[in-house]
Amino acid sequence: MKTRLGLVYGGKSAEHNVSLQTALAVTKALDTEKFDIHPIYITEKGEWVRGPQLTEPVSNVKMLQFEQTGQTFSPAVLNRDMFPGEADAKEDSIDVVFPLLHGPNGEDGTIQGMLELLNVPYVGNGVLASSAGMDKVVMKHLFAQAGLDQAKYVSFLKKTWSQSKEECYAQVEGELGYPCFVKPANLGSSVGISKCRSREELDQAFELAFQYDRKIVVEEGVIGREIELGVLGNDEPVCSVAGEIAPKKDFYDYKAKYEDGDTDLIIPASLTEDEYETMRSMAVKAFQAIDGSGLVRADFFLTNEGRVLINEVNTMPGFTPFSMFPLLWKQSGVEYAELIEKLVALAIERHEEKQQIKHTF
């Protein structure tokens, strides 16, 4: 019997287009002998629109946008058990949901919470891990509690900054110095990130970052290599080989990731056995610190002095075939289609485990 897999993508997020690219790649890779593929598009206005079941790959993202041709529906009908005896609801129901959403409302625990309430199995991290992994400040606090070495940072609220800009800038200069990186606390794909070398650039960077979030984080500039590992699993996570990001630009921004191709991905990264083992151990600890499940990509700095610093974990990493996470697993012996199937299996495993939990006493 085939698995009815709901692909949820798009969303009210600055990473809407990234999500569309991910959905396109996944639809091309899925085996229609194993899965009934049901596309569910969230428009930029936040409307849920369901398209027809996909029986063959689509060629471009426009074919996955159903504002004009799809059927608006309530996500509540994803669970057939909530609508016993209703034929339409049963037809709409899904066995497993794969949220292919990046950024706020998709990667931050929001949709995960909805799916938990509906008791629908879903791929990837749960509410806690997703929200902690989205908020860079909370994430860094958890890493510190877990004893993971990381770069120095400070964080600011927009209200604090608007009332005392000069004091904020002085704190950055006093505690971190230049260069430093300014980032929205709750956004990915390098959206809204700036590298600063002066007070003037710092002011511009704060202005930009606060357009995307009410909270930002400023990190010290680290001189060294950027290394990433993929983590896969639930309670017994395993790691992929390591990969290195070698941007041809000053840093790995949104354009370098998704538009220009001005970045070399070196897989496997050239590391000593001790360096890899340190990163592997830290990646697992970071995964466990946020209570991860399914997948994360763990990002590290390897300084010129040989110090390993964890930068962040991404709970829904870029997932196109040319993204780092799938490429890491391909080099580790897991092809793209198999990776998707493993993630679906992990989602079902976790859901079945949760069903054994008692809710009465």
UniProtKB/Swiss-Prot annotation:
Q: What is this protein called?
A: D-alanine--D-alanine ligase
Instruction: Kindly give the InterPro entries that the UniProt entry links to this protein.
Output: ATP-grasp, ATP_grasp_subdomain_1, D-Ala_lig_Van_CS, D_ala_D_ala, Dala_Dala_lig_C, Dala_Dala_lig_N, PreATP-grasp_dom_sf
Q: Which organism is it from?
A: Bacillus licheniformis (strain ATCC 14580 / DSM 13 / JCM 2505 / CCUG 7422 / NBRC 12200 / NCIMB 9375 / NCTC 10341 / NRRL NRS-1264 / Gibson 46)
Q: Does the keyword Zinc apply?
A: no
Single annotated GO MF:
ATP binding
Report whether Metal-binding shows up as a keyword of the record: yes
What single Pfam family name could you report for this chain, choosing any that match? Dala_Dala_lig_N
Q: Where is Mg(2+) 1 annotated to bind?
A: 299, 312
Q: What class of enzyme is it?
A: ligase
